[in-house]
Amino acid sequence: MEKKLSIAIDGPAAAGKSTVAKIVAEKKSYIYIDTGAMYRAITYAALQENVDLTDEEKLAELLKRTDIELITTKDGQKVFVNGTDVTEAIRTDEISNQVSIAAKHRSVREEMVKRQQQLGEKGGVVMDGRDIGTHVLPNAEVKIFLLASVEERAKRRYEENVKKGFDVNYETLIEEIARRDKLDSEREVSPLRKAEDALEIDTTSLSIQEVADKILEAVEQKSR
């Protein structure tokens, strides 16, 4: 029987991590864990309860009493906060622009990492985020680091938002993504960086399927 591996996919905002991770998980019949959605969920909960995102203590306290569930359905993964479906609500620009603030706090990340490690401990998972290969699943058999230019990532996010009917400005998206890159790579706790043993894939000129195929190839090599 083929060993069930842990697959870590890291990279900056809008590099195509979750789209690719879902394809890989489906192909391998693995569980997909979107760690970014977990940080978005606590950001959403904080905004709902008027908790200041810069107040680490209050945010950590809110997280302790917030139940975040990732549930796989036939329509894809659903995200629930305290039993309420927030799958669409956590994908707005308001959340996207503030999630890095919530994610930079040490106590918030420690609690999230604990939850993520529990989800990934048995293998057979594809987990994507910013610090999966370096911090959450440092022993993952397959580690991937996705890259793409800021312009390409802004273009993808723009097309994604237009499809959803959101009113967006391409230039604004470039600025927002560059700002998130800065926040993610400069934060003190688990900054965005490539694990030493990760396979780096520049996705700028590749289709989503081509990226997924490269990852699946790496998985096959490790499974032998």
Curated annotation (Swiss-Prot):
Binding site for ATP: G11, P12, A13, A14, A15, G16, K17, S18, T19
Gene Ontology molecular functions: (d)CMP kinase activity; ATP binding; CMP kinase activity; dCMP kinase activity
Pfam family, one: Cytidylate_kin
GO CC terms, sorted: cytosol
EC numbers, comma separated: 2.7.4.25
Knockout mutant characteristics: Essential, it cannot be disrupted.
Induction per the UniProt record: Transcribed during sporulation. May not be transcribed with the downstream gene (a ribosomal protein bS1 homolog), there is a probable transcription terminator between the 2 genes.
Cellular compartments annotated: Cytoplasm
Stored InterPro entries: Cytidylate_kin, Cytidylate_kinase_dom, P-loop_NTPase
An individual GO BP term: nucleobase-containing small molecule interconversion
Catalytic activity: CMP + ATP = CDP + ADP; dCMP + ATP = dCDP + ADP
CDD domains in alphabetical order: CMPK (cd02020)
UniProt entry keywords in alphabetical sequence: ATP-binding, Cytoplasm, Kinase, Nucleotide-binding, Transferase
Range of residues in the leader sequence: none
Main location: cytoplasm
Keyword Transferase: yes
Family: Belongs to the cytidylate kinase family. Type 1 subfamily.
Protein name: Cytidylate kinase
Species of provenance: Bacillus subtilis (strain 168)
